[in-house]
Amino acid sequence: MAWLGVAVGVLLLVTAAVTAAGWRGDAGSSTASTPSDSVLSHVHGLGVNPADGQLYVATHHGVFRLSGAQATRVGNGRQDTMGFTVTGPDEFLASGHPAPGEDGPRHLGLIRSTDAGRTWQSLSLAGQADFHLLRFSRGVVYGLDSTSGALMASSDRVSWQTRSTVEAYDLAIDPHRPDTLLATTEQGMRRSTDGGRTWEPAGGPPAVLLHWSPRELVAVTADGTLVRSVDGAATWSSTAGRAPGAPVALTVHENVVYLATEEGRVLRSADAGATWQPMMP
């Protein structure tokens, strides 16, 4: 119960920040409202590509690759890339909105890249769904549609089932059991063991971001504290460190934690959140 009394006001602030971070981009030339090809703005998602070991950042203005201390826009796409997940070597799934001036539907539905974000193809739900969260495990894709609040699932990336309605900051899937999900919500963490059809309180910390790897479950609270669980969220441990800034995106790869903040900073921690280092100057 001690967890539940922490950071409620900060959670509301994070909700407002996430809601304010909408979709923009430009497939053509840069405009005054579009950042340069090396500037991150409104980060929505993070993922490490197994093909090159590099961190990819989904933003308000396309997808960037972080290599060393440099961010480089991948391809010419400047779509507002909201939902984002890496599903395999050079394969990404995403959603969102086209850049201003681009042809096509207002909502991208599910799109896929098989060349590490250089080009994208529409797979399903174009014009119908705007997934602000996408998660993948063992062949199942889960998407949280911002237009309806529906949690949807697909095993072929074409046909979808609506499982429930849930207001979540983030979702994580058990890497061994794709029907087991955790969601971070304003009411606390919630768990589903039937593929998102029903939910129950899961206890635990007042987290906003989640990442579930085969090794452990990692969560970040609204004040930037990193907590970990090695028993499927039954118990949690935390470190003394705290990430600077309001957290908006999280991923973990080979024991390195990557975190993006509302200010557009991307940080890394190799000591479970005890200390954080910026990835760009």
Language-model features, listed with the residues they occupy:
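Asp-box/BNR beta-propeller loop motif
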Residues: G62-V74, H107-S124, M152-R163, R190-P201, ...
